[in-house]
Amino acid sequence: ILSRSESDITGIPTGFAEMDKMTAGLQRGDLIIVAGRPSMGKTSLAINIAENAAIGNQIPTAIFSMEMSAEQLGFRMIGSIGRVNQSKLRTGKLSDDDWPRVNSAVSLMSNAPIFIDDAPALTPTEIRARARRLKRRNNLGLIVIDYMQLMHDAGTKENRATEISEISRSLKALAKEIDVPVIALSQLNRS
């Protein structure tokens, strides 16, 4: 018999109350595609969700970033967690008020189960192998992929739309196989 839990969130909390209310959190085995035009905040949203999972809830989180280097992603996360302006971080022109927040953010990140893989142009098979390893070694709980159009499917010789469709199917199979939510970012173009 099912009993009502204290929280209405049955999956991984995103850190966004309204989203969690609508979805009950990110559910195991789900593929969540976040699509939008360039520079609309897809990566920022995914990073915020990953931070909430790994730092706020100690859920081992893998980020496969084919767009940004691990260093760039790390700086974005430090800025987000520490509430420090990105350009100040990049240039090193931090105020005396910024330093404690940066130090706190670095400390939180160093103790969080966040795994960043910035290898370019991964295939679904390569992501599956890496995710399986993280699941086995670290009990992986969430995967973020930034972004699908930078992936390639070695077995597909069709057009790009068919290839992206096949990549989506592979990512859904991965989510079900290792029983974690997978957030895949997708860039929409004008056409």
Language model: regions and residue ranges:
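Substrate-engagement module of ASCE P-loop NTPases
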Residues: 52-55, 163-183
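Short hydrophobic/aromatic beta-strand immediately N-terminal to the Walker A/P-loop
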Residues: 32-33, 62
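Cytosolic-facing regulatory segments adjacent to core modules
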Residues: 21, 44, 48, 52-139, ...
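Pre-Walker A segment
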Residues: 1-30
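The conserved Walker
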Residues: 38
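Conserved glycine(s) of the Walker
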Residues: 41
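Residues immediately C-terminal
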Residues: 150, 190
